[in-house]
Each structure stands twice: as structure tokens, then as C-alpha cells.
Amino acid sequence: MSESPKKVIVGMSGGVDSSVSAWLLQQQGYQVEGLFMKNWEEDDGEEYCTAAADLADAQAVCDKLGIELHTVNFAAEYWDNVFELFLEEYKAGRTPNPDILCNKEIKFKAFLEFAAEDLGADYIATGHYVRRVDINGKSRLLRGLDGNKDQSYFLYTLGHEQIAQSLFPVGELEKPQVRKIAEDLGLITAKKKDSTGICFIGERKFRDFLGRYLPAQPGKIITVDGDEIGEHQGLMYHTLGQRKGLGIGGTKDGSEDPWYVVDKDVENNVLIVAQGHEHPRLMSSGLIAQQLHWVDREPFTGTLSCTVKTRYRQTDIPCTINALDDDRIEVIFDEPVAAVTPGQSAVFYSGEVCLGGGIIEQRLPLTV
């Protein structure tokens, strides 16, 4: 008797990547069903969020492929485990990455549990551009084949057990191939542009959105030399390395370097700026990271040479990691790096393999 095909639940977002993922899995002989997750309740009456349109697109794709689409509402889990933490970080003057939190708490936790327990799935699948491979009996995370679209940075919190239960069909393809497949199949999502912005904000204006949940606290903008040159509307609206939107004009006569945010003094509600994108105050020799997640789930001890990204789409930076204690590491860069931002994630790689990462707690200044 032949074994019945394994059941996969694909997280259908209404985008092209998850659409093609579902079709690819059908071709590979899996029993495929879709699941649309609603993670945010629109309470503002304005059609900021495209959830309804995305659901309609996901349904149209599932109809075309002849697969069932389930829907689930994870808005409560999202609010408690992603959004509240996101606001807390902003209040503390840090710059969090909600997409990483969403993958950790919703897509590879709430969704994984729901698919297995309620829908009887053997696997879940998503449209992420990453690959998985087994190394010494443990599933490991690799960068996506399309270096331009690789999303391993957002998935570093996943452990080998979660990866073992997850499939990433488009991770083996390049984006133009994915669009071509969707076009050839006549899928409604073939030409849909990639979603940008944070999942719960959609394309809406970030400043307006944040201002609804956190009261703005205006304060001084001060240069590294201590001169007051303007007022900011709230530290939460600014991130290290930012140049636009400071409201202090570029330069007096156009000949000087523009102003960049180089630091935040949270205690005194002061934004600190300097001229030039390579100003020493903007550069770091390394960082301290905490809340570590290693894909192999082995504790890190000792020292390791590898590469790191301190933000998405950054070129890999050669570095050395030193264990400080169970949940903190010191990372020393081979060369100084600009705009290392507390609250963001530092993600480590050995070649194609994503090793894991942690939250940047502090940056290490250049030693003069």
C-alpha cells in the first residue's frame, strides 16, 4: 500500500510568493491546503490595511489551484506577543523589528500549532526566500537562492525543530522565476507588488500610526558639540543614521555635509546629530547582543569567527563573537560599521548557513 501524501498547510498572504509555493508543493505530490491569517483588527475605519483585498486574492488563487482555504484570527496573539512589545521598545528609545517578532510568535508558533493540532498538518509552508537543509540530523536554515530576496535575517529565531516542520518552496528559486510561474498559471497575484512596511501598518504613514498609540514628546536636537539646532517631535520617530525628516535643513550654504542622527539620549529626550555619514559617533567597533536564538539550539560558548548583518539587506560584515554569559555576546567587527541600532537584530552566518542571532543591546563606540 502506498503511503498517503503528507499534508501541508501553506500560509497564504494573498501575495505571489505564497501562491507559487502552494502550486510547487502540489507538483511535489503533497496534499496542499491554504490558511489565511488575520493578525490585525482595523479599528480606525480607514482602509489602511489591505486584509480584505489580500484575503480575496488568496481565495482566488486557492480556487484556481483547487485547494481549500482556511482562515484564522490571530489578532489577540499578535497584540499580546508582537504589538505590545513593539510599543515598549519604541517607548524605550529603541528601534524594534516587528517582522522578526511576527515570524517568531505568529507564523512559526501560533500558525504551526494551529496547522498541526486543528488541521492535522505534517508541515507548514510559507513564501519566504530561505532554504532548509539537514546537517548532522538537525534541520538548518540557509539563505534563499536569490541573494537579493533572501529573508533568513527575519527567521533567525527559528529552532531546528520548527524548521524541520516547515517548507520553503520559493527559496530554491529567484524572484523573476516565481513571477513567471504565476503568470504562466494565470494567477491573479502574478503582477501584485511585494508588500512593504510592517504587516499591521501596511502602507500607512508610520508616524501617524505610532502617534495614535504613543504620545509624542518633543525635545531638543543637539549637535555632538553641544549646540542646540532644532526640535524633534519624538525620539521614537528617529533612527540612527537617519538623514531625512529632521527638519533642520541640510546645510547652511550647501557646501557642508548633511546632518545625521548619531545617538539618542533617552533620559533627557535629546536627539544627537552630526555632519557626514561616516562621523565617528555614527560608527561602531562592535556590539553587545542579548535574547539570543541559535538555530541548532546549542548554547554558545567561547569564540567564533563568522559574518553578521546588523540590518536587512546589509552586506555581510566579518566579525568575531565572544560569549559573555548564557544570553549575551560581544561582537567585534573587522572594520567599523555605521548606524548599528539598539533594538534591531544582529544575525550571524557561516557561509550560506544562518546560525542565529540576537537583539542589539548596545553598540561599542570606536576607541579613539
Swiss-Prot record:
Catalytic activities: S-sulfanyl-L-cysteinyl-[protein] + uridine(34) in tRNA + AH2 + ATP = 2-thiouridine(34) in tRNA + L-cysteinyl-[protein] + A + AMP + diphosphate + H(+)
Pfam families tied to this protein: tRNA_Me_trans (PF03054), tRNA_Me_trans_C (PF20258), tRNA_Me_trans_M (PF20259)
Residue ranges of the region described as Interaction with target base in tRNA: 97-99
Highest taxon in the source lineage: Bacteria
CDD domains: MnmA_TRMU-like
Gene3D superfamilies (UniProt xref): Adenine nucleotide alpha hydrolases-like domains (2.30.30.280), HUPs (3.40.50.620), Translation factors (2.40.30.10)
Disulfide bond residue pairs: 102-199
InterPro entries: MnmA-like, MnmA-like_C, MnmA-like_central, MnmA-like_central_sf, Rossmann-like_a/b/a_fold
Record-linked PANTHER family: MITOCHONDRIAL TRNA-SPECIFIC 2-THIOURIDYLASE 1, TRNA 5-METHYLAMINOMETHYL-2-THIOURIDYLATE -METHYLTRANSFERASE
Assembly and binders: Interacts with TusE.
Protein name: tRNA-specific 2-thiouridylase MnmA
Organism whose genome encodes this protein: Salmonella arizonae (strain ATCC BAA-731 / CDC346-86 / RSK2980)
Gene name in the database record: mnmA
